[in-house]
Amino acid sequence: MPISESFARRLFPLLDELTNTYPTPFHIYDERAIVQTHRNVAQAFADSAFRQYFAVKALPTPAILSLLLKEGSGLDCSSPVELMLAERLGARGDDIVFTSNNTSLSEYQMALQAGALVTFDDRSMLEQVIALPDIVAFRVSPHGVIARSSQMGNAQQSKFGIPEAELVQSYREAWDRGARRFGIHGMMCANELSLEAAVQAGVQVIEVGARVAREAGIELEYINIGGGLGIPYRIDDQALDLTAYADALKRALKQAFPHNTPKLLMELGRYISGPHGVLVSRVINRCSKGREIVGLDASMSALMRPGLYGAYHHLTLPFADQRPEGVFDVVGALCENFDKFAVDRLLPSPLIGDLALIHDTGAHGHAMGFTYNGRLRPAELMLTDDGDVVEIRRAETFDDHTGPIQWQPVDVFNPTRCVK
């Protein structure tokens, strides 16, 4: 949906001069709103043991991660590079949750060395690690109606987590290996806007945790319910009631664990930063090909979600409101027909040179970018709380793109030299 009134009020007066001096396309984020959204989440759970871990995969840009760390957020990492990024920014020990899948032993060892809260996605890894983390946590696989109805796909085909039926034995095996401190992780929905469904998804994890703890004879120090809270991408979407959501989960946690209530952890990414970013681009082409086509200087390399998922992102021409409307396809320049930001979208009639804003790109936007076709990833800017615009990641260049190339091939293996 459109960026907030506060963001628009501070950004729009700057856009004309900014885009005359700084080339489009670029993502720009609202520092004030990202910080405030984190604070809102923390406040909703303020009367309970709780910590939010920002999902690095959503927006792995150091300037943003540093802001959130200073606010008391932890970082949710799922790869070695994300771990290294978190450590480079000063995150230590339980500032980091490592929740990954299809994970190599070396990656687990790296997370263990960082002192992170490690989530085992597969029980077989428990047998391979030489030393266990201080707290052993397993991820329960998505299951039930909520998981099937979310963007996570069919729960029966999920690659994530351990089937619920195997959890008790997994914890018993960890106990036999000497583990005495435990947590549990589960994420049962994705981009969920229904309060009822989001609560049900969280309660499922809490109830599974209570049953497993009882049957395995262990105590849980924390329950991590992952992310999953949605944002209103469409104009008619309604934002989830955060206070009601938090209150329902706190009640469920107390009911399931009346004594020694575990700490609640969350790994929100999209919810924290998603609404507070916009991709600023410019119209560079207009043509008719049986359909009215509007070409932007941004491509799918800057925002993959519409092409990959068919995801909706609100798109506006901020300085074209008085023109007659028409129906247009808005496209990028990749040699792929799915490089489209919008199809059959009602818009004021665009002119070449118009600015076009694609909204809600503060999560899974730049982070999912790629360089196919030599279309490089754009810059990232931030509108600071003081009203300044700062560059937090420059646009990629030809040298960046070709940096790993060996222009003169390097011999790495020659079978004729092998000793038989």
UniProtKB/Swiss-Prot annotation:
CDD domains: PLPDE_III_DapDC. GO terms for molecular function: diaminopimelate decarboxylase activity. PROSITE patterns: ODR_DC_2_1, ODR_DC_2_2. Its cofactor is pyridoxal 5'-phosphate. One of its GO terms (biological process) is lysine biosynthetic process via diaminopimelate. InterPro entries: Ala_racemase/Decarboxylase_C, DAP_deCOOHase_LysA, De-COase2_C, De-COase2_CS, De-COase2_N, De-COase2_pyr-phos_BS, Orn/DAP/Arg_de-COase, PLP-binding_barrel. It holds the Pfam family Orn_Arg_deC_N. The modification N6-(pyridoxal phosphate)lysine is found at residue 57. PANTHER family: DIAMINOPIMELATE DECARBOXYLASE (PTHR43727), GROUP IV DECARBOXYLASE (PTHR43727:SF2). Belongs to the Orn/Lys/Arg decarboxylase class-II family. This is Protein TabA. It comes from Pseudomonas amygdali pv. tabaci (Pseudomonas syringae pv. tabaci).
